[in-house]
Amino acid sequence: MAIIEASNRAYLLAYQRNARLMRLLEQVAAIDDNVRELRLRRGRTFVERNARSIRDLQARGIADPDVDPLLAATALSAMVGRMAYTTYVIGEESDLEQLVTTLTRLWANALRIPDDALQVQEK
């Protein structure tokens, strides 16, 4: 869980630092095909990395083997990205630590990672 938590925290902090740029990219991507394609490629990079991590967790018997890794990575990445957008661009106030904790728990729950498996792996 520490890796998921650290990844979520790093993403949220980077998004927070770059909120104005992220807002602009979102707006321009809606009207410019080149920018939209750039954002899609950037997003795919994160999704593919997350899918590899999910496959690894499945291979180690930690995550639900019946979950499609690529689809799960796409959905979970979208969840974190949209929360970052809602918080730092739209301005829906949320405490960083509460965001990190909640998003990390949702990740673990979605992959049906038991708490005890995470504690054993982190030691």
Regions found by a protein language model. Give the residues of each.
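Amphipathic alpha-helical packing segments from all-alpha helical-bundle domains
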Residues: 13-17, 23, 33-59, 70-74, ...
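Short, hydrophobic secondary-structure boundary micro-motifs
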Residues: 22-25, 37-38, 66, 119-120
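Transmembrane helix-loop junctions in multipass membrane proteins, especially transporters and channels
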Residues: 90-94
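C-terminal effector-binding regulatory domain of bacterial HTH transcription factors
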Residues: 113-123
